[in-house]
Amino acid sequence: MQAARGGAGRPGREGRGLERECERSPGVGAAMPPGPCAWPPRAALRLWLGCVCFALVQADSPSAPVNVTVRHLKANSAVVSWDVLEDEVVIGFAISQQKKDVRMLRFIQEVNTTTRSCALWDLEEDTEYIVHVQAISIQGQSPASEPVLFKTPREAEKMASKNKDEVTMKEMGRNQQLRTGEVLIIVVVLFMWAGVIALFCRQYDIIKDNEPNNNKEKTKSASETSTPEHQGGGLLRSKI
């Protein structure tokens, strides 16, 4: 029983010894290996510093582009455009393009500080695509923008819409020509009426000016055809 008690008591003493070692600070000249309560290893310290640096870089990285839209959509091409915040200083942009439900990714990098659009080519007709845009600065890349989903039209649909546009343009041209012809006809008729009215007024003025002369001539002729005068100045008397 004593042996059992003694054996059971030894581990307790050893445990208390370890606790005392943890409480004591190592001596100046001690060459003992670090105990259970030693300082963290260098790997953990490096990991912590790396996390801090990564957080600082993320804080200085630009914001994600905004107002990402797809325009000039065709069967085999499209144009993606975006905007950035006014205070952001960027040196380029990265565009990620992929098909919907497909992991294949196309990466396009634009090293231009003024561009706000990028052309997408070699697209497949009647296919859905997803586009992301990232801003690039000296500190790194920004988070990806909101995904934009678009679908390319079919070539037949594009041709049909193009034909409709052409027909509409032709109809507009014809209507414009008809309107121009109608306006010309109206102008010509108005000029003709103006000429007729001017000619009538002129003839009326001429006729009105000639009326007094005609009246004088009629009066003179009437006086001449009245009773003739005698040569001596008296009137001739009829003989009974």
Curated annotation (Swiss-Prot):
Pfam families: fn3. N-Glycosylated. The extracellular domain is cleaved and released from the cell membrane. The record marks R106 as: Required for dimerization. A motif (Microbody targeting signal) lies at residues 238-240. Residues 1-10, 231-240 have a biased composition (Gly residues). GO terms for cellular component: endoplasmic reticulum; extracellular region; peroxisomal membrane; plasma membrane. Residues 1-30, 210-240 are annotated as: Disordered. This is Fibronectin type III domain-containing protein 5. The gene is Fndc5.
